[in-house]
């Protein structure tokens, strides 16, 4: 009986140890997956969201699709293909946004040593609000890329006046899209970088770098957190701070030519910044 009791005690003790090891192993696996996808941001995300929940919202793959992207796509299926929809119902911010974008673009386009005015690529274009008001007045041709087919279908009507200058529409998620090599004078990326993981944003910026012509520039315009990284559960996006963004830019082989804060937005809004980037091979 004493031997039997010792046997059960031994088995019970090791069962507990096995449970601990399994639990810690699972935590390690989840942690590693998140760190792989959000290598610059994951510690900030884990401060706010428990590990298992964060994994389920981001890195978990269900039916072949990563949940960070699947949830964003579900969100945008409910967004109307209108200017109001593109602005998140803050349509009053559209005019100051357009004006600031035009002025920022002028600093880097036209003239010796600057980007040309041949072809621009509008990434995460939606219905083409930026193309219509910022890019088409400047460039001979514009291409649009967005993951939502409904937005691109509406863009064909929305941009009808300039349809002869719209070269093509690409229905792709940006993590799956590769710009044509050496094709673009300007690649415009606005309010969409937060829908890419750190890993995929780094890779996408690198591919955009390769898509630039000589003296071409990337314009990155997005919300910038005051500190750390903020995860928006409603639309499955992240807002990165300046240090995280600049680190990803640097690692992608790009350098910052200039940056400027968007003015004219309410103080309660998350700050919006514009960055002009080009290949570090031209530095």
From Swiss-Prot:
The keyword Magnesium does not apply. Coiled coil: none annotated. Its EC number is 2.1.1.299. GO terms for molecular function: N-terminal protein N-methyltransferase activity. S-adenosyl-L-methionine binds at residues 124, 129, 146, 174-175, 190. It is found in: Nucleus. One of its GO terms (biological process) is N-terminal protein amino acid methylation. It comes from the Eukaryota. The keyword Protein transport does not apply. It is an enzyme of class 2 (transferase). It catalyses: N-terminal L-alanyl-L-prolyl-L-lysyl-[protein] + S-adenosyl-L-methionine = N-terminal N-methyl-L-alanyl-L-prolyl-L-lysyl-[protein] + S-adenosyl-L-homocysteine + H(+); N-terminal L-prolyl-L-prolyl-L-lysyl-[protein] + S-adenosyl-L-methionine = N-terminal N-methyl-L-prolyl-L-prolyl-L-lysyl-[protein] + S-adenosyl-L-homocysteine + H(+); N-terminal L-seryl-L-prolyl-L-lysyl-[protein] + S-adenosyl-L-methionine = N-terminal N-methyl-L-seryl-L-prolyl-L-lysyl-[protein] + S-adenosyl-L-homocysteine + H(+). Alpha N-methyltransferase that methylates the N-terminus of target proteins containing the N-terminal motif [Ala/Pro/Ser]-Pro-Lys when the initiator Met is cleaved. Specifically catalyzes monomethylation of exposed alpha-amino group of Ala or Ser residue in the [Ala/Ser]-Pro-Lys motif and Pro in the Pro-Pro-Lys motif. Predominantly functions as a mono-methyltransferase but is also able to di-/tri-methylate the GPKRIA peptide and di-methylate the PPKRIA peptide (in vitro). May activate NTMT1 by priming its substrates for trimethylation. This is N-terminal Xaa-Pro-Lys N-methyltransferase 2. It comes from Mus musculus.
């Amino acid at each position: 009986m004493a031997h039997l009791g010792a046997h059960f005690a031994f088995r019970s003790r090791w069962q507990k140890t096995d449970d601990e090891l399994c639990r810690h192993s699972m935590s390690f696996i989840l942690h590693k997956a998140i760190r792989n996808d959000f290598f610059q941001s994951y510690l900030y995300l884990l401060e706010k969201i428990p590990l298992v929940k964060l994994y389920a919202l981001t890195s978990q793959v269900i039916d072949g699709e990563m949940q960070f992207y699947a949830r964003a796509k579900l969100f945008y299926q409910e967004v109307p293909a209108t200017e109001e929809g593109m602005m998140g119902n803050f349509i009053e911010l559209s005019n100051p946004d357009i004006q600031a974008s035009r002025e920022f673009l002028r600093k880097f386009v036209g003239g010796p040593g600057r980007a040309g005015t041949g072809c621009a690529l509008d990434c995460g274009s939606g219905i083409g609000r930026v193309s219509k008001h910022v890019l088409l007045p400047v460039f001979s041709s514009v291409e649009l890329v967005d993951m939502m087919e409904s937005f691109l279908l509406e863009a064909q009507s929305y941009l009808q006046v300039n349809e002869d200058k719209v070269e093509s529409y690409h229905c792709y998620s940006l993590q799956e899209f590769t710009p044509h090599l050496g094709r673009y004078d300007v690649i415009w990326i606005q309010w969409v970088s937060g829908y890419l993981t750190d890993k995929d944003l780094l890779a996408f910026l690198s591919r955009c770098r390769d898509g630039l012509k000589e003296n071409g520039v990337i314009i990155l315009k997005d919300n910038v957190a005051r500190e750390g990284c903020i995860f928006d559960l409603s639309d499955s996006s992240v807002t990165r701070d300046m240090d995280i963004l600049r680190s990803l830019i640097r690692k992608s082989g790009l350098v910052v030519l200039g940056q400027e804060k968007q003015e004219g937005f309410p103080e309660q809004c998350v700050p919006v910044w514009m960055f002009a980037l080009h290949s570090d091979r031209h530095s």
